[in-house]
Amino acid sequence: MSTCIEGTPSTTRTPTRAWVALAVLALPVLLIAIDNTVLAFALPLIAEDFRPSATTQLWIVDVYSLVLAALLVAMGSLGDRLGRRRLLLIGGAGFAVVSALAAFAPSAELLVGARALLGVFGAMLMPSTLSLIRNIFTDASARRLAIAIWASCFTAGSALGPIVGGALLEHFHWGAVFLVAVPILLPLLVLGPRLVPESRDPNPGPFDPVSIVLSFTTMLPIVWAVKTAAHDGLSAAAAAAFAVGIVSGALFVRRQNRSATPMLDIGLFKVMPFTSSILANFLSIIGLIGFIFFISQHLQLVLGLSPLTAGLVTLPGAVVSMIAGLAVVKAAKRFAPDTLMVTGLVFVAVGFLMILLFRHNLTVAAIIASFVVLELGVGVSQTVSNDTIVASVPAAKSGAASAVSETAYELGAVVGTATLGTIFTAFYRSNVDVPAGLTPEQTGAAAESIGGAAAVAADLPAATATQLLDSARAAFDSGIAPTAVIAAMLVLAAAAVVGVAFRR
């Protein structure tokens, strides 16, 4: 029989103050989503200003997610102990200040340092918002609606990021994309202390710095190893880092199991709705983030759209996702969570398979249609899974539970880009036909990626450039079909996990 996650019966009206508090809590979610996408558009201008090495340029992009993923579990547990609102406000203030520093960074190295600090403060924001919602909204129906609104803000931010970034970069210095954080976070810092009630674990136990270090040395090496292997191939350094992460993880689990007051209660993973929802999110995000990354390149490098126009192509899907997330709140009163999650995940898989169907004529209209179906499924499945995650654990542990959920999201994004990227690149390299007469450096760059081919083509005679670009675009599109199939299989695997686990 399906498991339903229950909350306080819907007999009392949620006070207006709670909904105003939700509006305040939505601000950092909107910011993080925007921040995840705008840097990609600013990177060419940053490279033009600082002329960083390829390694430094990768660190500008990657260091934020490395630090964020490494600290999420520790920050979630810290919020349970020190107070979730307090941690949220510290994170908001720090994120705003460091964003301003990043905007005016005088060198690439200082920008890397600022991005690392943004990862520290960003790790304080996301778990705090979701766990505070869990404690503010005790009524099950109101909580589902609140989480749907919370999730829709993330979707809206992801859609607005390319649009905001494109608009700012057309008129201002690249630092403007970092300054976006300041006006978004200012209302949080002013209104948060007045409108958002404090909550914490009433019996948190002693502070455990050893567990914090172990959680950090688990996540950081693993994420770094996956990213490094994706960029440079498997190496001894990546393998060693991965091994360090696995050993640290084993020591972390052992310490938590032996502690009377663990930083992360490993027993949470015995709750099947919690664990299956986490795993489903992880698998679906691998497919979603990895595949969206390549579709955005198709829009810009194959179809020739500007970053701003490419961002607008994804907007209809984002709107549908928000509507679906809000609509599923009513459906949750009639259908079990696993039924809704599986239905949503199937829609996501169908969206991927539509890309496969249109692969020989992947126009803007075809991409919009596919993304509308895909994002409809995302809106349903993510809203229900996030509600299930926070509702299936005690309120006192909601910070740690939210942190685990966010960690799964970050890991899924990293693994998705890395694994699907490797597969996609392999298809590109095996199908691209580089014209004769190019220098070894030009041949290597053109054979590496479609972006490299476009850069090389800019310095070639018109006929040779056209020949190279036609071949590069065809080779790029050859990877779309297998990537779509793999993404669909991952999402269907997530649906199977939910369908089986909820019936145990």
UniProtKB/Swiss-Prot annotation:
It is found in: Cell inner membrane. SUPFAM superfamilies: MFS general substrate transporter. This is Multidrug efflux pump LfrA. The gene is lfrA. It comes from Mycolicibacterium smegmatis (strain ATCC 700084 / mc(2)155) (Mycobacterium smegmatis). The lineage of its organism: Bacteria, Bacillati, Actinomycetota, Actinomycetes, Mycobacteriales. It is a multi-pass membrane protein. InterPro entries: MFS, MFS_dom, MFS_trans_sf. Pfam families: MFS_1. Gene3D superfamilies: MFS general substrate transporter like domains (1.20.1250.20), Multidrug resistance protein D (1.20.1720.10). Energy-dependent efflux pump that contributes to drug resistance. Catalyzes the efflux of norfloxacin and several related fluoroquinolones (FQ). Contributes significantly to the intrinsic MICs for ethidium bromide and acriflavine. Overexpression confers low-level resistance to hydrophilic FQ such as ciprofloxacin, ofloxacin and levofloxacin, and to ethidium bromide, acridine, acriflavine, rhodamine 123 and some quaternary ammonium compounds. May contribute to resistance to certain beta-lactams. Probably uses the proton motive force to export drugs. NCBIfam families: MFS_LfrA (NF033896).
